[in-house]
Amino acid sequence: MKNILIFGGSGFLGSWITKSLLKKNLKITIFDLRIKTELLKNLIGDEFNNIDFIEGDITDFEGVLKATKDMDYILNLAGLMTPDCSSNPSLGAEVNVKGSINVFEAIKRNNIKFLIYTSSGGVYGNEDKYNPFPETHYGAFKLAVEGIARAYFNESLISSVGLRPFVIYGPGREVGGTAGVTLACKAAKQNFEYTVGFSGKVGFVYVEDVTNLVERLIDKAPLGAITMNINGITTSVENFISIIKKNIPDAKVKFSGKPLSVVEEILGGDPSKIFNDFKYTSLDYGINKTINFY
């Protein structure tokens, strides 16, 4: 049985990835600053007892180095989200940039040759659909990590894939600047009022599309320092809410606020460049699954 270490693995995305990877007969270890178990237990049930946990700080290099020893695969999902990076940019850089360097350096010293990490659609600004031009601290830190990944490939032949998802939604996505559409699904099902705090068009990605890509990338482990745009289905927040109301007509959900500081859609570098049969989950299906979870 091969070993996989997931930094930041007890959060929303990490919990879903763990659920997905359990069927691959991998020994999973989760490294996180604060271990969160509620969603993970909900998703995987009794298999929770087969997961190992390390409570540690990604900014502590010795702890990261020790955790990566004897691992076959590494995923780095750890990082502060957009609001935290904006309110404390120094801490955001410490965690998102220095923490990522620690992971790259640790896998280099432990002779591991492939890493999957989360970048973000936030590396784009609000005009250019092809070229990254971040307009938030979070996006700037993520773009810096992509450059660091290229340096580690050029200098040490460590291959990596940086996943650039747009707005991920799905059961359990309740933290972060774009969690509002998932919280709207929860509000609709539980019959309370909720206002999504942004407007405009953006790409919506159902969480299991990301977990599917992680599964396949572990098997393929492409060579190079690759970035993968995961745009999802581009639509307006207004339309997203209309689909919620198609499921629950009396839902008390609405939206307000400015559009996000990113383009409506990112083009090029999508998953089909590596997996030509890849297709995104429809909004109708993804929203229905999210509502029914609650």
Q: Where are the predicted features?
A:
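A conserved pocket-lining segment of Rossmann-fold NAD(P)-dependent short-chain dehydrogenase/reductase
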Residues: S160-P171, L183-V205
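Mid/C-terminal beta-alpha module of Rossmann-like enzyme folds, strongest
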Residues: A184, L213-R216, K220-P259
